[in-house]
Amino acid sequence: MASNSLPPFIGIRIKPLTEEQKNRAIRTLDIFVSTLSEKTSGILPNNFVVTIPKVTIPEHVTAIVQLFEILEEKTELASESLKLELMIETPQSILDNNGNSALPSLVKASDGRCTGAHFGVYDYTASTNITAEYQSLTHPNCDFARHMMQVALGGTGVRLSDGATNIMPVGPHRPTDGNPLTDSQLEENKMVVHNAWRLNFNNVFHSLKHGYYQGWDLHPSHLPLRYAAVYSFFLEGLSSQSVRLKSFMGKAAQATLIGDVFDDAATGQALLNYFLQGISCGAILEKDVEKTGLTLDEIRTRSFKKILEGRQS
């Protein structure tokens, strides 16, 4: 904070509030937040959050909120300044004992402090009896859980994040005692890294296709492939999406047929979302929006309905 070099989002993930680990979780958060507040005179980094793993019942969230209130009272932190994210890692976090969605009650228990919900691929698949060989971000069980999160938390302002790829792009062979690797070892390292990169690229692309624009990375070498997947996702469709949106807007949002694709008013927001997400991540430049026939001010309304109303007034 002193050197103004922090990332735009930052936080701490504590241990889960299980019987075995709750005391450690509370102690860790107390020490961390108290020390941070003391060093910064009660100022938190921008977008600071506490991530709560393995949340299964609203009482877990309520307990954290109560702890937040105690910490804010005993330090110089402003009231309600501590925010949290939920990790959705078990079937109990998706559906409660009555078969209802558990997610709204978990968020409600946060008393307005919940900013995000993160899907935990490997704990969730293990909880649904998927064997280790078939645990993956693209497993149908994971798609179901992520879709439930979207349906339950859509429109609430809670950001959704996908899980991680657990295959590391790290070769199995390393030089020892000054001996260089053989050609076959170098080739095997290359193959392992490229396979891991390919898997990570495909996983990120899968998340994007399902409407998840944020995800976890476990290794620095995952980052280049996330950038590649995100930029590829948006740039490959930029030309066609621009034509569709421009044609649609040019006909005052009447239904249009571009090639073999039929667009009506229901498509408008989806097309707008494409540009909003692309601009947000940096893949699409604001000047690219001009090709759609929309102005930047119209794009910034984030609402296709408002754009239409503005043009009709």
What function would you assign to each model-found segment?
Residues 1-313:
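Expand to "…catalyze enediolate/carbanion chemistry for C-C bond making/breaking, isomerization
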